[in-house]
């Protein structure tokens, strides 16, 4: 099971919604996607332990997505963190942090590693290109598929040799009597959970192709229908819903809500006309995803 926490679902100017921050958790692994101003305060006040964050993935260097990161890292240092922190992000992120730390007289006292992708404990985090007004990337969080052997079927067919079963599970074909046992005939594949987060983006083919079939898509929905979001490199609710429909995702979270909207009911209504499995998460809500 994966758990997605919607820490900050707003964007741009502060509002009743926090600035962008989304936490994905699975069995001891915590991945923070974007870190707007105030992220660590919200997490600490709501018992989301910042020290458990293993990976931080930043989409781009606009202030509302990244300015909470230097202070979060400094707090981790003050709490005497020892574990390595992995950071993914666009070009310039490392320089931004280095200069901020120098000018605020802080030197990280735990290992920080900047990586282009991350894989551990059966989870992979990798970027995909988005369509914003500055260099920007979204992220896929993917759980590996698992394969279990249909031992009952094998027994019915008289195959009980554990060595044969092991070879089939390893994906190898096995000669058996006058035929060949093929692994695809006896393996039951359980598809892993897949989550996609766009950060800020226009609707575009690169995003659609990257998020095909995910279980949950968190897509920029800054404005309601009727506003030209292209000038700002953002999307409307109907544009986000169209991406979700074309990419055949399972669920759509409308995020990065502009501060101008206190009531998102019309935004949600617009999206659901196109993609019924849309929702607008509130700050500090969460969603459990099961394969």
UniProtKB/Swiss-Prot annotation:
It catalyses: Endonucleolytic cleavage of RNA, removing extra 3' nucleotides from tRNA precursor, generating 3' termini of tRNAs. A 3'-hydroxy group is left at the tRNA terminus and a 5'-phosphoryl group is left at the trailer molecule. It comes from the Archaea. The active site is at residue 64. Its EC number is 3.1.26.11. Binds 2 Zn(2+) ions. InterPro entries: Metallo-B-lactamas, RibonucZ/Hydroxyglut_hydro, RNase_Z/BN. One of its GO terms (molecular function) is 3'-tRNA processing endoribonuclease activity. Keywords: Endonuclease, Hydrolase, Metal-binding, Nuclease, tRNA processing, Zinc. The keyword Cytoplasm does not apply. Zn(2+) 1 binds at residues 60, 62, 132, 200. Its cofactor is Zn(2+). Pfam families: Lactamase_B, Lactamase_B_2. Zn(2+) 2 binds at residues 64-65, 200, 256. It is an enzyme of class 3 (hydrolase). SUPFAM superfamilies: Metallo-hydrolase/oxidoreductase. CDD domains: RNaseZ_ZiPD-like_MBL-fold. Zinc phosphodiesterase, which displays some tRNA 3'-processing endonuclease activity. Probably involved in tRNA maturation, by removing a 3'-trailer from precursor tRNA. Belongs to the RNase Z family. Homodimer. This is Ribonuclease Z. It comes from Metallosphaera sedula (strain ATCC 51363 / DSM 5348 / JCM 9185 / NBRC 15509 / TH2). The lineage of its organism: Archaea, Thermoproteota, Thermoprotei, Sulfolobales, Sulfolobaceae. The gene is rnz.
């Amino acid at each position: 099971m994966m758990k997605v926490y919607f820490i900050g679902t707003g964007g741009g100017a502060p509002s009743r919604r926090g600035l962008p921050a989304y936490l994905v958790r699975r069995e001891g692994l915590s991945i923070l996607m974007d870190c707007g101003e105030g992220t660590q305060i919200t997490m600490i006040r709501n018992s989301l332990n910042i020290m458990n964050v293993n990976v931080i993935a930043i989409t781009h260097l606009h202030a509302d997505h990244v300015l909470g990161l230097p202070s979060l890292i400094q707090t981790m240092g003050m709490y005497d963190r020892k574990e390595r922190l992995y950071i993914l992000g666009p070009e310039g992120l490392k320089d931004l942090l280095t200069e901020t730390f120098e000018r605020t007289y802080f030197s990280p006292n735990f290992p920080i590693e900047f990586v282009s992708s991350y894989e551990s404990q059966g989870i992979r985090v990798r970027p995909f290109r988005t369509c914003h007004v500055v260099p920007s990337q979204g992220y896929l969080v993917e759980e590996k598929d698992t394969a279990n052997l249909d031992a009952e079927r094998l027994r019915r067919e008289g195959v009980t040799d554990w060595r044969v079963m092991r070879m089939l599970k390893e994906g190898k074909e096995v000669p058996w009597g006058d035929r060949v046992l093929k692994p695809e005939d006896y393996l039951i594949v359980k598809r892993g959970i897949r989550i996609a987060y766009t950060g800020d983006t226009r609707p575009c083919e690169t995003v659609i192709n990257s998020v095909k079939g995910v279980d949950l898509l968190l897509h920029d929905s800054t404005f309601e229908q009727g506003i030209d979001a292209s000038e700002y490199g953002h999307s409307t609710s109907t544009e986000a819903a169209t991406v979700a429909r074309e990419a055949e995702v399972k669920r759509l979270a409308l995020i990065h809500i502009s501060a101008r909207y206190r009531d998102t009911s019309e935004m949600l209504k617009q999206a659901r006309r196109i993609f019924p499995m849309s929702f607008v998460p509130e700050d500090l809500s969460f969603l459990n995803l099961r394969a």
